[in-house]
């Protein structure tokens, strides 16, 4: 008997952008930047299933886009069976957390998407370390969003137990990981500098192949 795989494809994303008068020009989302975001999503292996671009006077400090647009995005997520929402603009950790709670799916911004692409394409040890370090630094202030199901308990009398302990444990773990990665990066760069000095001292020629992407340099 032939089995049919009915599981939906992963990384179906609704893309959201805001153009606001009170944002700097480079901070605003435009039709062109939204198209670029869609291309980035494809590069990362995802699929754009809908876009929402809002224009308003200023970002909402809580949800970045207006409450009405949040409801519109929520309905679009449901209608298109999306499993994530990606913002073209940068979100604060608190905005990302609130939006995740409101939309009931993973919420990312352009920075997180680009870091994911870098992680996929990093080939050298130094490159992989740099991307991992950037990802941990991006994650650290957003940890509370991952533990939002414990947020009601945090700080309450009689609840300073497993939930808050785990959150602090994760923070300490990431701080240690960041310190370790920074140390490893420093060592990699030291070794590379030493090797470069040795090549120069020994007059070893350096050869570089130059050409366009996909021009057959490999």
Question: What residues fall within each predicted segment?
Answer:
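N-terminal accessory targeting/assembly segments
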Residues: 1-110, 114-116
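Conserved G1/Walker A P-loop phosphate-binding module
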Residues: 3-11, 149-218
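Register-specific recognition of a single heptad position within extended alpha-helical repeats
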Residues: 28, 64, 120, 127, ...
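Residue-level signature of catalytic and energy-coupling elements of molecular machines
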Residues: 37, 85, 136, 174, ...
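Residue-level signal for pocket-adjacent positions within structured domains
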Residues: 59-60, 112-113, 145, 152, ...
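Short alpha-helix plus adjacent loop in nuclease-associated cores
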Residues: 112-134
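A charged, well-structured terminal subsegment
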Residues: 133, 137-151
């Amino acid at each position: 008997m032939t089995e049919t795989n009915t599981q939906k494809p992963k990384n179906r994303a609704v893309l959201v952008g805001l153009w606001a008068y009170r944002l700097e020009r480079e901070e605003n989302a435009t039709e062109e930047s939204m198209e670029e975001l869609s291309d980035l999503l494809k590069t990362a292996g995802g699929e754009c299933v809908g876009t929402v671009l809002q224009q308003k006077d200023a970002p909402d400090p809580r949800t970045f886009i207006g409450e009405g647009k949040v409801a519109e995005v929520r309905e679009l997520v449901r209608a298109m069976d999306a499993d994530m929402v990606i913002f073209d603009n940068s979100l604060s950790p608190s905005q990302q957390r609130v939006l995740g709670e409101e939309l009931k799916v993973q919420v990312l911004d352009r920075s997180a998407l680009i870091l994911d692409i870098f992680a996929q394409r990093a080939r050298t040890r130094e490159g992989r370390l740099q991307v991992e370090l950037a990802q941990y630094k991006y994650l650290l202030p957003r940890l509370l969003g991952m533990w939002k199901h414990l947020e009601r308990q945090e700080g309450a009398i009689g609840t300073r137990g497993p939930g808050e302990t785990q959150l602090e444990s994760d923070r300490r773990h990431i701080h240690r990981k960041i310190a370790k990665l920074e140390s490893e990066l420093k060592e990699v760069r030291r070794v590379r500098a030493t090797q470069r000095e040795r090549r120069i001292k020994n007059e070893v020629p350096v050869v570089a192949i130059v050409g366009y992407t996909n021009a057959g340099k490999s």
